[in-house]
Every structure is written in structure tokens, then in C-alpha cells.
Amino acid sequence: MAKQSIRLSDHFTYGKLLRFTLPSICMMVFTSIYGVVDGLFVSNFVGKTPFAAVNLVMPFVMILGGMGFMIGTGGTALVSKLLGEGKQEEAHRTFSMLVLFTLLLGAVLSAVGILTMPAVARLLGASETMMPGCVLYGRIVTGFTFAFMLQNVFQSFFIAAEKPRLGLFVTVAAGITNMVLDALFIAVFDWGVAGAAIATGLSQCVGGVLPLIYFLRPNTSLLRLRPAALRLRPILQSCGNGSSELMSNISSSLVGMLYNFQLMRLIGEDGVSAYGVLMYVQFIFVAIFIGYSIGSAPVVSFHYGAQHHSELKNLLRKSVLLMAIGGVTLTVLARVLAAPLSRLFVGYDASLYALTTHAFRLFCWSFLLAGFNIFTSGFFTALNNGAVSAAISFLRTLVFQAGSVVVLPILLGVDGIWWAITAAEIFAFIISGVFLVLKRNKYHYM
């Protein structure tokens, strides 16, 4: 007998919560994996200098794409709340207007990225040997920013529409497109970093255009795309509510730039390459926490809108325990896989492999607390409290990490760079706990 579909209005057990969030977890993990494929192909088929070049400009690319996460997560919280209040038609209009806004903003940012890439590469500290790869890869990828943003927006809205499995299908289709084209353009056609960039851009078109077609046509989801005029208030509300996700993205990117600057100063290109490997693996591991946060957010928003306080308590209690179990599991897994994963990326260079493996074994302790911090920030976004969510993200991903990256190398040498993220997660854990306690009476989740 087939299992009944899960509704936002349901009471959630551990099993039902995992079943509902699993598609978004898989979606985020798969998105991270196919992003990692770029790094694997560039490192193994093009070389470590082009690999370092790609990693150097990646933070800027992610900042632009992060606008889509802001609109998607903030907009989903708003639309899910409207659905919980029974305002179906207003939810349709708001959803449609936010998709239109994403397209327009994405087109503008694509143009900005293409025009400013040489200056951006210089600002990020690219060496003369890295400059051509930085500019070529960066210009091509940022040209597809509109598609990247759409893909990020629809990842969240598929969940609010009660179609998380369809969202997973679209992500898998985009991922397979990227992997196949990477192999074709880099390994067969020998197009180098340009091939990696084109493969990524075309896969983002798949991830952004397929959902657009689905929501434009008659469908069985909770949401429809309809003609809509831009309205400032819901745009600002969505952007403000999703600002924590944008802040997290921007902060991570800025901190990535700071990491690269410190590593170029202390080690050189090998340090940037080693950090690139850590980031690719972190993308996959942290994607599990982000996917859970994205998947559970519409449920929290719905029950908040419906004033189901007992269900909010249930969701918070179960989620905190799941994040703790996930943190321990991923930390152990990262310790075990440090050497094999390092070998997969940079096994062709003995000294770089040794550096990466050592860094990995220090860096991996950050996974213990990352899940709790990511979920707490997303939880407040789902409660339509963008200010608290943004504060947690800002402190966690920028203030604490930047401070640690600057201070710890003075105390611990190069190892201080690899310990920095763990120190930041410890401080963020304290702040997240304080906010949960302070806001408990307002939202009745404890």
C-alpha cells in the first residue's frame, strides 16, 4: 500500500520529518556534488593552477547566485505563511511576482559580472599565471547568473508547493547535464576552464527553466505562475526575510576571499588549491544541513501562520536532535575520508596531497556544531524573523570566521587557518542558543 503524501498541515514524527525533508536534502547534496565535479575535472585534466584560478573567483560567483537563495528562502517563508492563513490567491500573486523579480535582477547581475570580472580577479589577488583562467571562467559562469538564481529560487518554492520530489528530479537532471558536459567539454574536447564554465552554465539553465515551464502550465501543486506586476512591499519583505541566507552566502564568500589571501601569503597557490578541496567537500557535507533547513522551513512557516504552537515545539525539539546526530556522524565520516578525498582531487602532487589531508583533519571538527547553527538561522527565517536569522548568519559566517582567520594564524601558524571555522562554529553555537531562549515566549516553540 502506497504511503500517503505528506502535507504541510500534518503532525510530524521523526520518520515523516525525514521523509518530507529528504528530497530537499538530496537536492542540495546533488547540487553540491555536481559542483564538485567541475573541480575534479579541472584539477585532474587541466592542472592545479587553473584549479586555483577557479577557486579564487568562485566566492564572487556565489555572491551573485546567493541573491536567488535570498529571494527563494525569504519568499517561500512569506508564501507558506499566506498558505497557512488560507490566502491562496495572494500566495499565487506573490510567488509569480518574485519569480519575475528574480529574472530581472539576474539579467542585471549577469551583465555586471561579465563587465567587472578582470577587476574582480585582480582585487581577489590573482597572480599573473592565474589571471587568464580567472577571467575566462568567471565571465562565462556569471553570464548564466539569471539561470543560477532561478534554480536557487525554485529549490525553495518546490517545497512550499508540496512538490519536493519534483524539485529533486529537476536538480538531478541539471546535475547529470553538468557531469556529462564536463566530461565532454574538458576530457574529450579539451576546452579547459571554459568547458567547465559552459557545462555549469548550461546545467543551471536546465535547473532554472524546467521549473519555470512546470509552474507556467496547469499543475497539481499548491502554486501557479500568473501575470503579476512588481510590488515593492512583498519584494522588500522577502528580501529582508531571506537576508540571512544572502548574508550567509556573502559572508562565506568574503571569508573565502580572506582565506585565499592568507593562504597566498603564507603558502602560495598550493594553499589555495588545498582550501578549494576543503570547500568542495564542505559543500557536500553542509548541504545535508542546508537541505534539511530548507525542507523543514515551509512546515515551520505554515504552522506559525496557523498558530499551531504545539507543532512548533515538536518541530524544534526533533530538529535539534537530528542536527546533533548528523553533526557527530559527519565529523566521524570526514575524519575517515580525509585521505581518500584528498587523493581524489590532488593525488597527482605528493606535497599538495599531504597538505590537504592534514588540513582536512583539522577542518572537519566544524561539522559537529554546523547543523545546529544552520538550522537555527533557517528556523528564524521560517518564523519570518529575518533580523535574528541574519544576525546569526552574519556573526557565524563573517564576524567569527574572519576574526578567527586573522587571529589564529598569529597564535598557531598555518594550522590556525584550518582551525578557524571550528572556532567560529563554537561561538555561533552560543549565540544561536541565546536567541532561541530569548525569543521562546514570542513564538511559543519551547
Stretches with model-predicted labels:
Residues 22, 26, 57-60, 100-104, ...:
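Hydrophobic residues within alpha-helical transmembrane segments
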Residues 9-46, 59-74, 78, 82, ...:
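N-terminal transmembrane alpha-helices
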Residues 72, 140-159, 170-178, 196-209, ...:
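Short runs within selected transmembrane alpha-helices of multi-pass transporters and secretion channels
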Residues 19-38, 140, 151, 174, ...:
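Transmembrane helical elements of multi-pass membrane transporters/channels
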Residues 51-111, 148-167, 274-338, 370-392:
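Small-residue-rich hydrophobic transmembrane alpha-helices
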Residues 33-51, 121-128, 184-191, 253-280, ...:
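Helix-terminus/linker motif at the lipid-water interface of multi-pass membrane proteins
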Residues 63-66, 178-183, 208-212, 283-287, ...:
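Hydrophobic transmembrane alpha-helices of multi-pass small-molecule transporters
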